[in-house]
Amino acid sequence: STATDSSYYTNQQHPAGGGGGGASPYAHMGSYQYHASGLNNVSYSAKSSYDLGYTAAYTSYAPYGTSSSPVNNEPDKEDLEPE
């Protein structure tokens, strides 16, 4: 998938570069965006895996933090202070 995107990008850039001076920047921008899109797709896949791992780790910590219930302790302490 990545190789095809790279090939397409190079193919587009070649004619775009030799096309016209005025349209060169516009074409270049479009080509770059296309390339970025392909790269983003790969990044998404990697991020998905990373996100999944991070979520799993966070979920592992989540129950521990919830068990601690520090927020519940706050109102209790505040109630005791005014008394």
From Swiss-Prot:
GO MF: chromatin binding; DNA binding; DNA-binding transcription activator activity, RNA polymerase II-specific; RNA polymerase II transcription regulatory region sequence-specific DNA binding; sequence-specific double-stranded DNA binding; single-stranded RNA binding; transcription cis-regulatory region binding
Record-linked Pfam families: DLL_N
Residue ranges, annotated region (Disordered): 1-27, 63-83
Compositionally biased tracts (Polar residues): 1-14
Protein's cellular compartments: Nucleus
UniProt keyword Transcription regulation, yes or no: yes
Coiled coil ranges: none
Lineage: superkingdom: Eukaryota
GO cellular component term, pick one: nucleus
Single Gene Ontology BP annotation: positive regulation of amacrine cell differentiation
Protein keywords: Activator, Developmental protein, Differentiation, DNA-binding, Homeobox, Nucleus, Transcription, Transcription regulation
InterPro entries: Distal-less_N
Complexes and interactors: Interacts (via homeobox DNA-binding domain) with POU4F2; this interaction enhances retinal ganglion cell (RGC) differentiation.
Family: Belongs to the distal-less homeobox family.
Record's function text: Acts as a transcriptional activator. Activates transcription of CGA/alpha-GSU, via binding to the downstream activin regulatory element (DARE) in the gene promoter. Plays a role in terminal differentiation of interneurons, such as amacrine and bipolar cells in the developing retina. Likely to play a regulatory role in the development of the ventral forebrain. May play a role in craniofacial patterning and morphogenesis.
Protein name per UniProt: Homeobox protein DLX-2
UniProt source species: Rattus norvegicus
